């Protein structure tokens, strides 16, 4: 009897030892497989250097500021350049082949024939109503005129920045500007804008809400108006809506594929809204020549340096979106 019990006990003991050995062997094998898999994944991630685009990324408006200029140090073989100039330039040059001549000169700087487009506009006021910038790089030439300095500044502010605009129903609602980036932009053949600031009881401050003749006039018969009022205060507006479209706009950031070249003038245009900060003159340059041929020759000479200060990763500006966007 004792022999049978002793044998049974040995069998159980051997079974436990064997099971424990098998379990440890399986554990070591699983650890080896897991560690090897993690090592392979780590090495693969380093080698591939994979990037994840567009997964739960916040929408911030302008995308171009997060990219490095892709054209830096390379020929501009796949890019387009639009050169906007006033009618007076063509009139003064008086040569039917002048654009062909400039195209050949741009070719010497690495811009293939057909990649540079010459766009003419009548004057600053007309261009302000319908600015459309479609090329990868856009250079706008403005002849300085002391009588149009403020109009030039507003146009530069419009085209050098990206704006998100929504319609305004001024007949039904009051409006307020929330911060420095919030502006009211009006375009049209004739924009006259009056405002009446309101207190917390929606009563006019220095004006009568029922009498537009008591409103403060901030623009008179202009084609482009960027209106800035006191932030955080409701305003009732009066606008010549028959000849003007006004939008509530938010500045998203710089439109980095646009540069403004000022022809003449003592100082470069300043498009800064905040008087306490340094002048905002990014991508605003000045050329001091009397003759337009010399202006264009200078642009050809410095076109690549000008483009290096820009980036082609910006949205195209189409004023039709301003008028019809809902």
Curated annotation (Swiss-Prot):
Keyword flag Ribosomal protein: no
Name of the molecule in the record: Outer capsid glycoprotein VP7
Region (GPR motif): 253-255
GO molecular function annotation: metal ion binding
Post-translational modification: N-glycosylated.
Species of provenance: Rotavirus A (isolate RVA/Cow/Japan/KK3/1983/G10P8[11])
Disulfide bonds: 82-135, 165-249, 191-244, 196-207
Signal sequence annotation: 1-50
Sites where the protein binds Ca(2+) 2: 177, 228-229, 231, 301
Function in brief: Calcium-binding protein that interacts with rotavirus cell receptors once the initial attachment by VP4 has been achieved. Rotavirus attachment and entry into the host cell probably involves multiple sequential contacts between the outer capsid proteins VP4 and VP7, and the cell receptors. Following entry into the host cell, low intracellular or intravesicular Ca(2+) concentration probably causes the calcium-stabilized VP7 trimers to dissociate from the virion. This step is probably necessary for the membrane-disrupting entry step and the release of VP4, which is locked onto the virion by VP7.
More info: Some rotavirus strains are neuraminidase-sensitive and require sialic acid to attach to the cell surface. Some rotavirus strains are integrin-dependent. Some rotavirus strains depend on ganglioside for their entry into the host cell. Hsp70 also seems to be involved in the entry of some strains.
